[in-house]
Amino acid sequence: MIKIFFILFLPLLLFSKYQIVTYFPLESHIIKKIAQNEVKIREISSRFIEDFREIPSSEISKLSNAKIYFHFGLPIEKEYAKLLKQKNSEILIIDLSSNIKKTDGNPYFWTDPFLLREVAKNIYEILVDIDKDKIEYYKKNYESF
């Protein structure tokens, strides 16, 4: 019985996708370019909003099942990071701006195409760390970004 169960559910494990959460579509777009269909992405907001909005508990439950939360390091994104971490202590919180030199007074570094390439590199490195089986796939997509 256990063997049958294992045989039936093995394909699900082999083809399962990592769930990733982002704050808004720009982060999702970059991740999709590198990971393509290898991850499932959920967005907290469909556009950038500076005010913290309460998320329904059913949505928080869905979001907190993610393996990674990518964000640009903005204050609003950090608030959502705390909320997700409370619900799932295992979630990786990744600040995509951690090694990027920002201009004083302008936190919107992603508008610079050269810095956006650094953001893509950060995403690539994290994806490779969590999914070592697809290193070449991610590398090819990252290089074509």
Segments (PLM) and residue ranges:
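Extracytoplasmic metal-acquisition and chelation regions
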Residues: 16-145
